[in-house]
């Protein structure tokens, strides 16, 4: 009889698609195992009428899943990396980070087809303070309005609630097959306009530190370059003690042996944005260095002001 591996996942279409993608990759290597998904509802899934920045706290989409891991209800969990706090629960580790999808944010337009064509005062939907702050720096005339829900729900709201545009992660659109939908008016947002969230486009597969069988299994789908880049980003996030209530962005790429990392902290209306870049070979050192530069330039004051609102 085959051993069954229980995989923890949120129950959104995107989360289940991502979990099934991981399972199919593992089945190629381990046909002797059966895999079963256990759907878990998180705090972030239950609270849909409030923006995440107002809910506060860390791990809004992972805490209940980590609890299931800690009490051995599941064997591993599949998360979107950008949802995973910079510090994990004791006894848990990231067992693998597969190859990253696009890290970029993406405009989905209602009528026009490019950022430059959006009219003055355009209504743009996003509940991300990171996206809002950077867009307002670029276009202070924008009217940013919160929008929650899964990808399908947000795409419906684009028209029903008369947004001029909404912003989604391109990776989610890709995984759900929406990039092939020719009826959508899409445009990538350059990192110079909107730097991605830490870990955006990457998956995090979390397991128990003590479960060597699962760790060995997950190691077969780990992508080293993605892991190195995400490490730099997450070290940066941890140093700043960031969460979804702070406009923080961080994005690393690897060119040859060099890691190129840019980090950003801003206030909610985009009137003050601090940025720093670093190049080097050690991801942890680079992430720390960029965070230290931003802290020396006043990032701590921005973060405290936002937390005390």
UniProtKB/Swiss-Prot annotation:
Its EC number is 2.5.1.61. It catalyses: 4 porphobilinogen + H2O = hydroxymethylbilane + 4 NH4(+). The modification S-(dipyrrolylmethanemethyl)cysteine is found at residue 244. Binds 1 dipyrromethane group covalently. Its cofactor is dipyrromethane. It is an enzyme of class 2 (transferase). Signal peptide: none annotated. The keyword Transferase applies. Monomer. Belongs to the HMBS family. NCBIfam families: hemC (TIGR00212). This is Porphobilinogen deaminase. The gene is hemC.
